[in-house]
Amino acid sequence: MTDSSRVLRIYTPTLGVLALAVLGVASCGLAPPTASQASGGQGGSAGGQIGGSVGGGSSVRQSGGSAGAGGQAGSGGNSGSGGGSGAAGGVGGGGTANSLSGGGTQASGGVSGRGGAGGSGGASTAETRDASPPDVTVDTPPPPPSRGPTPSQTGVKFPFPQNRENSRCVYPYLYRNEDVQAAYNQWKNDTVTSDGANGFRRVKRPNEPGTLESNSTVSEGIGYGMLMAVYMNDQSLFDDLWQYEQKHLGQYGLMDWNIKADGSGPTSGGSGAATDADEDMTFALLMADKQWGGKGSLGKNYLDIAKGMMSGLWNNEIYNYKYLRSWPGADSSTINLSYFAPAYYKLFAKIDTTPTSNWTAVVDTMYTVLNASLNSSNGNTGNGLVPAWCDSSGKPNGGAFGAGSGASPTNYQYDSCRVPFRIGLDWCWNGETRAQSYVALTSKFFNGITVAKMVDGYDLNGTPRAQYQTGDKAQIQSSAFIGPAGVGAMSNATYQSFVNDAYGVLITGKALVGGTYYDESWMVLSLLMMTANFLDYTAI
């Protein structure tokens, strides 16, 4: 081994381990590559591909997009599915900074595939966190994948990307901003439409399971869309989504939760607000004020609108000054713990100066309910698997509204799977020890299962629900489960490998197996958090 050989730490999601790839480039008669030339896939003698960091890996087709080319193999090697084998020391072509990993290009109406776990292609020095890249001369080097804060734009406070890591949390070893951009493009292409949007744009549900009208819009989707748009610096879409929301206000001045595809009004049973949607919109409006200031194309300033939303939330969706209602008119017998967003409420408490508002009391009360739901009767004291619906004592409420897609509200299902994300934010942003204690339970449970064996539904005791034990459903891995579980696991370095694995599955598109709208939404939101782009308002 020569002095110019380098040791590169590479994460391979299929193995779930860190590999040490030795780049003996000088011994093959080549100078080592520079950082600017190590983008997208330098072909060499060892290693697999992940996210464009390692050349010669396999390209994976994203749902709704076109397959990318993968990293180009070195001399004598072949790129493409399965991992092309490059000749020792060969230099691969790589991808451009605005392309998906491995040189796939974005196309209008879709996205190219991201490089998945590769075969024997060459290792690249791009995107490593612990190794400084060597030097090489190449005629036309591709630019490296973007990493680190984007310089401030005029009137924009935190343009994408930022990569502002929080010291309380761990992050995937090889995260890439290109992965987030690709996921966002795909979500936008598949779910955002002007059809039936009253002159603006909306988020549709093109193929969601269940009984809701096809292509309808749920207020939850508008909330998710506003969150994504503000962090991706997409002001035009943000404003359109909000203006669509304003066209569909219900009895309490809050958006009805399910709107017909043609925009003519709420669906049958779609009247009334949903608390999780309203709080996501409120937080997104606060972030819009921080991001852009002013009012954009809206009639009022973002901050003033957010304050109005906080008032609507407090007056209609808080019960007895301390319990989180699931919708206006509900009481403490029908609590959805996946609506509990303590990190938001701590921010609301700093901005909402209304004398009757006490967001701190809501935080404290709802943490008490969350902990009460983990008990010996439920069999979940050690795993953190909360029921979708419960009462204030933590007892599952099987008769609650919104059981969801045939899933019993007494199970850990498509509502409750979001809890580790919302609670994980409170640890990462605020150092809340109650949050840390909770996500320690879910992280230990899912880490013991492994990402590869996670399914889309569990009894509260941790047993996979019957329909997920055998057959095709036993292979289901949706991003709505994997993404939030991965975000929760960011709370402890013990679960670094689980975080890496979760990220690896999200970026391959393997987790897009359920409905397009819900899974793609949680893919983007989780990737934003995992790449340190889902920022804390108070830290900006």
Task: Give a label for each model feature.
Residues D472-I476, G486-I540:
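A cross-kingdom marker for long, charged
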Residues P13-S27:
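Bacterial N-terminal signal peptides
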